[in-house]
């Protein structure tokens, strides 16, 4: 007797926005709740600023068989999206357009068509939110193209507190990305296109890194004899990382026995000096 097991297919919704994209996500989730499962795979693509970025997002959405929901206020991006969505036969829903047109009719005024104006109600808060989202999106070398949009890029070997540092900086409104340096992986080419004063390298004493990694393996329930916590391997990684930092010409900070706050204070000092360049 054959048993027919049909896996539930969760609909994919791409949220395209020239701002944060939160509005589109809220509407998509509210609409999904009206269906039996209420489940939906939300993939937010925020801060779209060019036709190229819109095209890339649409190609991803097409590959995923997704519904495109957009909250674009820039007419050029909106027109391009709608044209390409029709050409690709992509289902798409405009969240912002009808509301803008409705208000335009009753106010007899034209919209400003400027993305993110609502953020100016509390610039500091939204700057922080934007930076946090940026840090999450471009954590651990994900999406190298985002490195060129970062205020700061943090590089270093594994377990030098790159991610905690970037999140700390994000809470200061600084868009920080980080890239792990591993001998077996060639660093992204974008890393070498960034001005040196916007890159900070983190290093650490080998003995301290050895203990940190050994504890990490213990926490994960893995053998402490793994290469990850091998002193010879650690020395090789640190030497390789310092070579990359030297090639870039960036500042290097020793994080040995330093709290994230201490490292961040030094990084902020470097950042503020660089802003004036």
Curated annotation (Swiss-Prot):
List the HAMAP family. Answer: PDRP
Q: Which keywords does this Swiss-Prot/TrEMBL entry list? A: Kinase, Nucleotide-binding, Serine/threonine-protein kinase, Transferase
The UniProt record lists the EC number as 2.7.11.32, 2.7.4.27
Coiled-coil stretches, from where to where? none
Residues annotated as binding ADP: 156-163
Report the protein's function.
Bifunctional serine/threonine kinase and phosphorylase involved in the regulation of the pyruvate, phosphate dikinase (PPDK) by catalyzing its phosphorylation/dephosphorylation.
Q: What PANTHER family does the annotation carry? A: PYRUVATE, PHOSPHATE DIKINASE REGULATORY PROTEIN 1, CHLOROPLASTIC (PTHR31756:SF3)
> Organism source for this protein?
Carboxydothermus hydrogenoformans (strain ATCC BAA-161 / DSM 6008 / Z-2901)
Q: Which reaction does it catalyse?
A: N(tele)-phospho-L-histidyl/L-threonyl-[pyruvate, phosphate dikinase] + ADP = N(tele)-phospho-L-histidyl/O-phospho-L-threonyl-[pyruvate, phosphate dikinase] + AMP + H(+); N(tele)-phospho-L-histidyl/O-phospho-L-threonyl-[pyruvate, phosphate dikinase] + phosphate + H(+) = N(tele)-phospho-L-histidyl/L-threonyl-[pyruvate, phosphate dikinase] + diphosphate
By what name is this protein known? Putative pyruvate, phosphate dikinase regulatory protein
Q: Name one Pfam family in it.
A: Kinase-PPPase
